[in-house]
């Protein structure tokens, strides 16, 4: 019998007997475990061989045998739990232990660095599953980061300085304003073993032609081996950076036929997905990666929803209490903001916008927040911390305003906290705030009726590229803000847009109302090197490494 099954049977027997040694019979014990008399005898003999109990059998009618426990079910359960932790079977651990507080304590004690069979393993605790990793779909901040570890694109953007770098394409040139040429490196392999072909690249880029920022791609051809020509309908100075974004990452052309591709994707990046469940994401260094092989062999993201209620509970990778910690922090390049929906009469009403933005000002939200949030929130007066575009203007409550609808996406505890504060403030002015929580996909599409939307945005480097690119790619914003997005996109591509002025106009009209900048924090280990927090609150796994202990 497998060891795990035998351990479960012993724990069950110990629990049924309340851990007490006793006189009993095979029939009684078999009834407790719902098995045959013969199987019960086999179980007892095997457990006795393991040293967990003794079984002194008595022969004869009416005679009772002696069962003595030498090991407690709790001790064996702890041993089994330790085994499951080492095997990264978090789903089975949750079933075994049951108590969430105990599971959390066990997980935290095993965070950080692990060295097993010559491999460096990093364990990270996160508050929600990361089930959708498909480039080009609606991806949240953390999914965007993970996708960058799994996939490659023609170009890549350095997370630390925002500079453009080579990736699958080793060089590129602009032939004319409407014609770009990229030179691809040969010998690139997908995680499932197949070599990347030009058809994979062409299919991946044609797949995203329906997205607003890629809709100006007229044709993609390969005039000679490992050469890719991209023809545009309008000039685009940002095209090389655009092709380094997550939507433009390269997929195997047969991706739609591969099982569960969104949760178990196959790319050409430094890490390959090994497991992705509601309890755990495991990625492993790809030995055939065309760039520098990752220094950390395996990254395990353990999911524990309970840490979502902690203000700084986004990403935890600190180990045991006795180990030295290293804290990395930065103020996010972005903010939480209110988005007024011009499709509803209250959302489009300028008086409503002025009054709501006045009573729900950043300082009011921070003032009414609990102290634990006040330490991490910074009032926002622009979409970026460096901007001060918002002006606080006293405004009177519009006559007849009795209720408003606020919508945000679920699995985000701070959305609930901020919405609760808003509800409290508006109630003091006799306005009822109806709150809707919807899925991220529903939020992204923006087809649901709501007066106001509570959103958050994290912009990546370089900011003059990503800010407009991010806002333009969210259908919800295009639905809510009635401007000519296509004309603005053309100006942005040509380098004719003053981005600060464009954002200031959105804030001045109260289409978007900045609320809070958030401090992003990673609590790491002193032994980890190369940990540089990016603007998404994560770090590049392949560049991090563990320093060996000092020689004795």
Swiss-Prot record:
Q: What is this protein called?
A: HTH-type transcriptional regulator SgrR
- Residue ranges the UniProt entry marks as DNA-binding: 26-49
A Gene Ontology biological process in which this protein takes part is:
negative regulation of DNA-templated transcription
Q: Which Pfam families match?
A: SBP_bac_5, SgrR_N
Region of interest (Solute-binding), ranges: 163-492
Q: Which UniProt keywords apply?
A: Activator, DNA-binding, Repressor, Transcription, Transcription regulation
Domain (HTH marR-type): give its ranges.
1-116
Q: Which CDD domains match?
A: PBP2_SgrR_like
Q: What does this protein do?
A: Activates the small RNA gene sgrS under glucose-phosphate stress conditions as well as yfdZ. Represses its own transcription under both stress and non-stress conditions. Might act as a sensor of the intracellular accumulation of phosphoglucose by binding these molecules in its C-terminal solute-binding domain.
Q: Which domain of life is it from?
A: Bacteria
Species of the source: Escherichia coli O157:H7
GO molecular function ontology, one term from the record: peptide transmembrane transporter activity
Gene3D superfamilies, sorted: Periplasmic binding protein-like II
Which InterPro entries would you find in this protein's record? SBP_5 (IPR039424), SBP_5_dom (IPR000914), SgrR_HTH_N (IPR025370), Tscrpt_reg_SgrR (IPR023767)
List the HAMAP family.
HTH_type_SgrR (MF_01449)
């Amino acid at each position: 019998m497998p060891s795990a099954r035998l351990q479960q049977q012993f724990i069950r027997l110990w629990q049924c007997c309340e851990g007490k040694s006793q006189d009993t019979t095979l029939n009684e014990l078999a009834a407790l475990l719902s098995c045959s008399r013969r199987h019960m005898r086999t179980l007892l003999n095997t457990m006795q061989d393991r040293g967990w109990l003794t079984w002194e059998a008595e022969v004869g009618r009416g005679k009772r045998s002696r069962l003595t426990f030498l090991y407690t079910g709790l001790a064996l359960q702890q041993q089994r739990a330790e085994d499951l932790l080492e095997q990264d079977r978090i789903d089975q651990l949750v079933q075994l232990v049951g108590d969430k507080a105990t599971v959390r304590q066990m997980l935290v004690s095993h965070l950080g660095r692990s060295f097993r069979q010559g491999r460096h393993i990093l364990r990270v605790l996160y508050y929600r599953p990361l089930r959708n990793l498909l480039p080009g779909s609606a991806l949240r901040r953390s999914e965007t980061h993970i996708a960058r570890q799994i996939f490659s694109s023609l170009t890549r953007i350095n997370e630390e300085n925002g500079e453009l770098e080579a990736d699958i394409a080793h060089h590129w040139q602009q032939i004319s304003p409407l014609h770009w040429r990229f030179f691809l490196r040969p010998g690139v392999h997908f995680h499932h073993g197949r070599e990347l072909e030009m058809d994979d690249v062409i299919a991946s880029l044609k797949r995203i032609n329906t997205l607003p920022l890629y809709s100006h791609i007229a044709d993609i051809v390969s005039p000679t081996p490992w050469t890719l020509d991209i023809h545009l309908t309008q000039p685009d100075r940002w095209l090389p950076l655009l092709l380094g974004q997550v939507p433009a990452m390269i997929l195997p052309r047969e991706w739609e036929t591969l099982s569960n591709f969104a949760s178990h994707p196959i790319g050409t990046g430094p890490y390959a997905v090994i497991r992705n469940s509601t309890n755990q994401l495991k990625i492993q260094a790809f030995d055939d990666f065309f760039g520098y092989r990752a220094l950390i062999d395996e990254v395990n993201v353990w999911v524990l929803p309970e840490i979502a209620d902690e203000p700084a509970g986004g990403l935890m990778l600190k180990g045991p209490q006795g180990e030295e910690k290293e804290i990395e922090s930065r103020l996010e390049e972005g903010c939480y903001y209110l988005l007024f929906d011009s499709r509803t009469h209250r959302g489009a009403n300028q008086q409503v916008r002025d009054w709501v933005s006045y009573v729900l000002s950043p300082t009011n939200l921070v003032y009414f927040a609990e102290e634990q949030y006040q330490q991490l929130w910074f009032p926002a007066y622009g979409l970026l911390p460096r901007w001060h575009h918002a002006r606080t203007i006293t405004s009177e409550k519009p006559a007849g305003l009795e209720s408003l609808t606020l919508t945000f996406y679920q699995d985000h505890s701070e959305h609930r906290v901020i919405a609760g504060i808003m509800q409290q403030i508006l109630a003091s002015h006799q306005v009822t705030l109806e709150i809707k929580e919807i899925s991220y996909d529903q939020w992204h599409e923006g087809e649901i009726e709501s007066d106001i939307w509570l959103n958050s945005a994290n912009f990546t480097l370089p900011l003059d590229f990503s800010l407009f690119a991010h806002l333009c790619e969210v259908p919800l914003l295009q639905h809510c803000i009635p401007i000519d997005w296509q004309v603005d996109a053309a100006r942005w591509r040509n380098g004719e847009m003053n981005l600060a002025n464009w954002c200031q106009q959105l804030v001045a009209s109260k289409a978007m109302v900045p609320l809070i900048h958030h401090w992003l924090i990673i609590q790491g280990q002193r032994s980890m090197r190369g940990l540089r927090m990016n603007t998404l609150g994560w770090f590049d796994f392949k560049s991090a490494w563990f320093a060996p202990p000092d020689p004795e």
